[in-house]
UniProtKB/Swiss-Prot annotation:
Sorted UniProt keywords: Coiled coil
GO BP, one annotated term: response to hypoxia
One Pfam short name: baeRF_family2
Protein name per its UniProtKB record: Uncharacterized protein Rv2629
Keyword set includes Coiled coil: yes
Length: 374
């Protein structure tokens, strides 16, 4: 998960309430179940002496949120000042999670976030395209109607002008493909989408792909979704594109796992594992990707700054800082990673780093732990 969108959490002052719950809307009693869930959440927060304004802001977010479609979860992160995260999850969490802490708890977001990178969906035919740009919660739509005409070849074989008509048709198709290709190229250059989905009949997709410049064509994922005029709704577009995003997510985790194992194996200094090494790398701003495994109830200590994390008090004292707080590792380490702009990846049991946490590093530091002691 890219952490840029969560960067503003670092500037917020706690305590934070982090709540993840089943927000599915697939039964007749969905509204009643949501109300019951919220009552349980409220009771738990009250038992932890959460401030009333924090509870009120969460309650308002729950009651005013748009209902989910089908089986979904919901993530809420709030302080007494504002709701910082309020979004659906791709599925319900295994159980309701409620945290009240100096840190926001973001680990379930890594697993279940619905938010996608910027992408484009284009439904094309030989007359033009319907193009949508997705950036976070914003959707920008453009209809491209090419000026080339006609785009259908005659079926009458004996017509004297068939050759000229065929040439005119092919030229019209090329003009319209060029208009769509030019628009997609401008979108890619301006918005930098991670993927450009192209749907439509095979010939329309093939002709467009051959017209696109290479820097755009490499981002294209073709979808077999029928003709442009089928006019897919947002839920259908979501379902059609989900497989590609799932594939990319799996490929990302696979790549991280392979790179981590390779760097650990060769002792390059470009990977770290275990609480001591990862905390040191986070303090140095050296973490490119944080790998979060099963941290359980593990804790770390921090100095005055919430991002000054160490495995224990002795390591912190070597930095000349007293212990200001003891924090859960699964809260403090992702928070520190967000602060340095690192990506967050969940270990799916393929990596199993020491102490349940690992990292890919931006640069190799010789004897990092020893240098902090000297």
């Amino acid at each position: 998960m890219r952490s840029e969108r969560l960067r503003w959490l670092v500037a917020a002052e706690g305590p934070f309430a982090s709540v993840y719950f089943d927000d599915s809307h697939d039964t007749l009693d969905a509204v009643e179940r949501r109300e019951a869930t919220w009552r349980d959440v409220r009771k738990h927060l009250e038992s932890r002496d959460a401030k009333q304004e924090l509870i009120d802001s969460l309650e308002e977010a729950v009651r005013d949120s748009r209902p989910a479609v089908g089986q979904r979860g919901r993530a809420l992160i709030a302080t007494g000042e504002q709701v910082l995260v309020n979004e659906h999850l791709i599925g319900p969490p295994p159980a309701t999670v409620i945290r009240l802490s100096d840190y926001p708890y973001v680990v379930p977001l890594i697993d279940l976030e619905m938010r996608r990178p910027t992408y484009v969906f284009a439904a094309v035919d030989h007359t033009g395209a319907d193009v949508k740009l997705y950036q976070g919660a914003t959707i920008s739509s453009t209809k491209i109607d090419g000026v080339g005409y006609p785009v259908h070849k005659p079926v009458t074989a004996g017509w004297n002008g068939y050759g000229d008509f065929q040439h005119t048709t092919e030229e019209a198709i090329r003009m319209n493909c060029r208009a769509v290709a030019d628009h997609l190229t401008r979108l890619v250059d301006a918005a930098d989408p991670e993927v450009v989905f192209v749907s439509g009949e095979v010939r329309s997709r093939t002709d467009l792909l051959s017209t696109l410049p290479q820097r755009v064509a490499v981002r294209v994922s073709q979808l077999h979704a029928g003709p442009r005029k089928s006019a897919l709704d947002e839920e259908e577009i979501w379902d059609l594109t989900s497989a590609e995003f799932t594939r990319r997510r799996y490929a990302e985790i696979t790549n991280v796992a392979q790179q981590f194992e390779a760097e650990i194996g060769r002792g390059s200094g470009l990977a770290a594992q275990g609480l001591a090494e990862v905390c040191a790398a986070l303090r140095d701003g050296d973490v490119d990707t944080l790998i979060v495994g099963e941290l359980g109830e593990a804790t770390v200590v921090t100095g005055k700054a919430r991002t000054t994390v160490a495995r224990d008090a002795d390591m912190l004292s070597e930095l000349g800082e007293p212990v200001d707080r003891v924090a859960r590792a699964d809260e403090a380490l992702p928070f520190a990673a967000i602060a340095v702009g690192a990506a967050l990846v969940r270990d799916d049991n393929r990596i199993a780093p020491l102490d349940g946490v690992g990292a890919l590093l931006r640069y190799a530091a010789t004897n990092r732990l020893g240098s902090h002691r000297s």
